[in-house]
Design a protein with these regions (language model features):
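A short beta-strand micro-motif common to beta-rich folds, especially ectodomain repeats
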Residues: 89-101, 171-184
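Bacterial N-terminal signal peptides that target proteins for export
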Residues: 1-9
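Surface-exposed binding patches on compact interaction domains or structured appendages
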Residues: 35-41, 47-81, 132-163
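Short, surface-exposed loop/turn segments at beta-strand-coil junctions that are enriched for proline
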Residues: 83-88, 166-172
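Extracellular interdomain linker/stem segments of modular secreted and single-pass surface proteins
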Residues: 111-119, 193-200
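Bacterial Sec-dependent N-terminal signal peptides
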Residues: 10-43, 100-102, 108, 357-368
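Predominantly extracytoplasmic/ectodomain segments of secreted and cell-surface proteins
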Residues: 24-56, 105, 112-138
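Ser/Thr/Gly/Pro-rich, low-complexity flexible regions
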Residues: 193-368
Length: 368
């Protein structure tokens, strides 16, 4: 859970907006010139309001040096009233108080900017069934919420933001968004409806750009299958028993592949993963990852009828190698060849009724 903290939209975590001053910026220094101040309450929140200053002696005249602050006097009392502050920053001015033509004092007046705080993730993930989730909102002036996606209904009332989603009967994951609006502007929040077993698990084409024996780049399709094994996830590649461990990111609905992971055996070789954000960043370190998020593309279904439209890409420069090692301890010395190697890796989910193509066949189409 990431805290989204706005000071007129001051944000920490997934969302990124503008910053206003903290309460620590407030000062109330009093510059006295012969008039003794008995009591002064001169710090205001963004809503504004009225507070009091008491001095020794009757006040003959008092005024504020900013249009957003007004003064009234009665005896030794000066009341200061501030208007609501809808600016991004806190603001400061002074009030001058006189008890005679020569006796006066100057008092600092400070007012905070708007404040809104939400504790919520940057991406909200809900199941395919109809449901809702609520988050507490602390806000000076409140927020406005809206969504152009018919299946997402955001609502703000009584200090809470509630997001309600309709049942997902589309047969695939779906992504949408809603907008939060406050004094600082607008911020979009992602919403995903997905069920791993229904929408992501199953058969895929793994598409990858490889270099053939003639040193020409070719786009190849491999049969693949995304499955859950206990608490772990694997991507089976081909029909030779190779199972690539993958990390399922439930918070963003994506996959990562780490380097140095054992993926089974092929003939006498141990298969291990080597990945990098680009060829120059390849490493056997398990901290080296390539990652991508699942999306739905209707264009893909129009292009290839066998596909259900669910797509994930690890990025065009990202490189995936399933290396063949002569030892289960993966190293440069034990690396002998590769089972698979290329860039621009995609996963395309097949419809459940689609029969698998022969493993390692050259594709008759290109999807990218």
């Amino acid at each position: 859970m990431n805290k989204i903290l706005f000071h007129a939209f001051c944000v920490m975590g997934c969302l990124s907006l503008l910053t206003a001053c903290e309460k620590g910026d407030i000062t109330n220094d009093i510059d006295t010139h012969s008039v003794k101040v008995l009591e002064a309450n001169t710090s205001f929140d963004a809503l504004g309001g009225t507070d009091s200053i008491y001095v020794e002696g009757n006040v003959t005249h008092a005024y504020a040096n900013a249009s957003w602050a007004k003064t009234q006097t009665k005896g030794n009392l000066v009341t200061v009233t501030t208007e609501p502050n809808r600016d991004l920053q806190s603001r400061h001015t002074t009030v001058v108080i006189k008890t005679s033509d020569v006796d006066s004092t100057v008092i600092a007046i400070d007012q905070l900017g708007p404040y809104t705080q939400l504790d919520m993730p940057g991406t909200i993930v809900l199941d395919d069934e109809a449901g809702s989730v609520s988050y507490k909102v602390v806000s000076t002036f409140g927020i406005k919420v809206s969504s152009s996606d018919s299946w997402i209904t955001p609502k703000y009332e009584h200090g809470a933001l509630t997001i309600t989603t309709a049942k997902n009967d589309e047969g695939h994951l779906r992504r949408g968004e809603f907008t939060i609006e406050s004094e600082a502007g607008k911020q979009k929040v992602k919403v995903v409806q997905v069920n791993f077993d229904k929408d992501l698990k199953g058969k895929y084409y793994l598409q990858i750009d490889e270099t053939d024996k003639n040193n020409k780049q070719v786009t190849t399709l491999y049969n693949a299958s995304l499955e859950k094994k206990g608490d772990a996830y694997v991507l089976k590649v081909g029909n030779s028993g190779v199972e690539v461990p993958v990390i399922y990111d439930a918070d963003n609905v994506g996959l990562s592949i780490a380097s140095g992971q054992a993926a089974g055996k092929f003939k006498q070789y141990y298969i291990g993963t080597v990945v990098g954000a680009s060829e120059s960043k390849l490493s056997l370190s398990p901290s080296n990852l390539i990652s991508g998020e699942f999306n739905y593309s209707e264009e893909v279904t129009k292009k290839v009828a066998d596909l259900d439209g669910t797509v994930l890409t690890f990025g065009k420069p990202a490189m995936l190698i399933l290396g063949a090692f002569d030892s289960p301890q993966f190293s440069n010395d034990s690396y002998k060849a590769f089972y698979l190697m290329g860039t621009n890796v995609y996963l395309y989910r097949l419809k459940p009724t689609t029969a698998s193509a022969k493993s390692f066949d050259q594709p008759t189409f290109k999807l990218k």
